[in-house]
Regions:
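A conserved beta-strand element that flanks and buttresses the S-adenosyl-L-methionine
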Residues: 157-158
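Conserved beta-strand signature within the Rossmann-like core of class I S-adenosyl-L-methionine
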Residues: 179-195
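Core SAM-dependent methyltransferase catalytic element
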Residues: 304-314
Length: 314
C-alpha cells in the first residue's frame, strides 16, 4: 500500500482544468496530471540531454553528504514541495539516514502518479513516508502544511527550479512562512544564460513534454504552434521569464471528457501555458533574503547554471 492523503481531489483538478482552459490558460500543475504528461515528463528526466534536471540532480548528489551534516542525529521531517517523482529527494534522504538522522518524508504534489512514485521510492529505501496531494500555493493547503506542536525539526525542499514555476518573489515568502526557528529550507534556481537558456526549452525533447497535455485533449501538432518567449521582469535586475503559449492555426476543439464536452479555440487564439523564471545568482539570493531568509550554505552545478541554497529564518 502506498500511503497518500488528498487535500486536492481529482474531481477538483478536472473542474479547475476546464475553468483554466476556458480562460485560455494551462497552469503548471496540468503538465504533470494527464497520464501522457507524466510519461513525457519521466522520459524527459531520463534523457541526459535535459540539462536542467541533470544539473539539479547532480548538484544534490555532489552536496548530499555536506548538506546532511547540517542536521544532528535525531528526528527530522523532510517536507518536499512540488516533489514530483522524488528521485532527487531520495538522494538526500539516504544521506541523512546514513548520518543517523531519523527521517520522515512528506512529499507534496498535485500529481497522483508522481506522488505515488516518490512515496514508493522512499518506502523501498526503508524511510518512513506519507504523500500529500495538495497545491502548496493555495492558501488553505499552505495552512494545512504548517507544523503541529509535536512536529520535529523540518527540512523543507523546493528544488528543481520549483520556485521559478510560479512567481518566485511571492512563492518564496509563502514557503518561508512554513519555517519555525531551527527549520531549514533547501531551494534552487536556474541561472540565466541568454540564448542558451531559451535553447534549453525550445528543442524537440522539451517540446514533446510541452505538447503532452494538448495531445491528451485531442489537439495535434498540425493544429497550431508552440511559441517560446523570454522577457525581463523589472521588479529585480537579473530576473528573467521564459514563457510559452499555444497559438491555434485553425479552429480546434479540445475534448473535456468522455461525455463529448468540447471547448473551442478559434484560429489565432492563444492558450497561455506554464512559465519558468530564471535568475542571476545575486537576484536569487536577494529573493530569499526578501522572504526573511538567511543563507547558510550555497553551491552551484558543475557548469555554473544552477544555484542551490540552504537557508533558515533570518
Amino acid at each position: 500500500m502506498i500511503p497518500v492523503q488528498a487535500l486536492l481531489t481529482e474531481n477538483e483538478l478536472a473542474d479547475e482544468f476546464v475553468s483554466a482552459f476556458r480562460a485560455r490558460r494551462l497552469p503548471e500543475k496540468f503538465f504533470y496530471w494527464f497520464p501522457l504528461s507524466v510519461r513525457a515528463w519521466l522520459a524527459l528526466c531520463s534523457d541526459g540531454a535535459y540539462r536542467n534536471f541533470e544539473r539539479s540532480r547532480s548538484l544534490i548528489a555532489r552536496s548530499a553528504g555536506e548538506l546532511a551534516g547540517s542536521f544532528p542525529p535525531g528526528p527530522l521531517e523532510v517536507l518536499s514541495l512540488g516533489a514530483g517523482q522524488g528521485d532527487k529527494d531520495l538522494i538526500l534522504l539516504r544521506a541523512l539516514a546514513q548520518r543517523g538522522v531519523r527521517v520522515s518524508y512528506l512529499p507534496v504534489d498535485t500529481s497522483q502518479a508522481l506522488l505515488e512514485m516518490a512515496v514508493r521510492g522512499a518506502l523501498d529505501a526503508g524511510i518512513a513516508a506519507q504523500g500529500l496531494k495538495a497545491d502548496f500555493l493555495r492558501p488553505d493547503h499552505l495552512a494545512a502544511l504548517a507544523a503541529e506542536p509535536e512536529t520535529p525539526p523540518r527540512l523543507v525542499l523546493v528544488i528543481g527550479n520549483t520556485l521559478g514555476a510560479f512567481d518566485p518573489v511571492i512563492a518564496a515568502c509563502d514557503v518561508a512562512a512554513l519555517l519555525r526557528p531551527g527549520d531549514l529550507l533547501l531551494a534552487d534556481g536556474e541561472l540565466y544564460a541568454g540564448d542558451a537558456t531559451l535553447a534549453g526549452y525550445d528543442n524537440p525533447l522539451n517540446r514533446r513534454f510541452a505538447w503532452a497535455p494538448l495531445h491528451a485533449v485531442g489537439i495535434r501538432d498540425g493544429d497550431g504552434e508552440l511559441v517560446f518567449e523570454t522577457r525581463d521582469d523589472h521588479r529585480f535586475p537579473g530576473l528573467h521569464l521564459i514563457s510559452k503559449h499555444f497559438r491555434a492555426d485553425r479552429d480546434v476543439e479540445a475534448l473535456m471528457g468522455g461525455g463529448g464536452e468540447t471547448l473551442r479555440l478559434a484560429a489565432g487564439e492563444r492558450l497561455a501555458m506554464s512559465h519558468s523564471y530564471k535568475y542571476v545568482a545575486s537576484t536569487f539570493l536577494r529573493i530569499l533574503a526578501g522572504a526573511g531568509l538567511a543563507v547558510r550554505w550555497q553551491g552551484t552545478s558543475d557548469d555554473g547554471r544552477f544555484l542551490m541554497a540552504l537557508a533558515g529564518r533570518a
